[in-house]
Amino acid sequence: MEEPTPEPVYVDVDKGLTLACFVFLCLFLVVMIIRCAKVIMDPYSAIPTSTWEEQHLDD
């Protein structure tokens, strides 16, 4: 008797696309959490010093 030939493995495109989008969203979430944590720890480092305006107080 001949051995049955193995069936070709079909890639489910929908499942692959869903998994890729899920991984991308997880990476995006991790990056955003890290950025937000950095801003919370040191909020003034995120502001460029060129936008700071000196206040002139008139006496």
UniProtKB/Swiss-Prot annotation:
Membrane topology: Single-pass membrane protein
Keyword Transmembrane helix: yes
Record's subcellular location: Membrane
Predominant location: membrane
One Gene Ontology cellular component annotation held by this UniProt entry: membrane
Keywords: Membrane, Transmembrane, Transmembrane helix
Transmembrane annotation, as ranges: 17-37
Protein name (Swiss-Prot/TrEMBL): Cortexin domain-containing 1 protein
InterPro entries associated with the record: Cortexin (IPR020066)
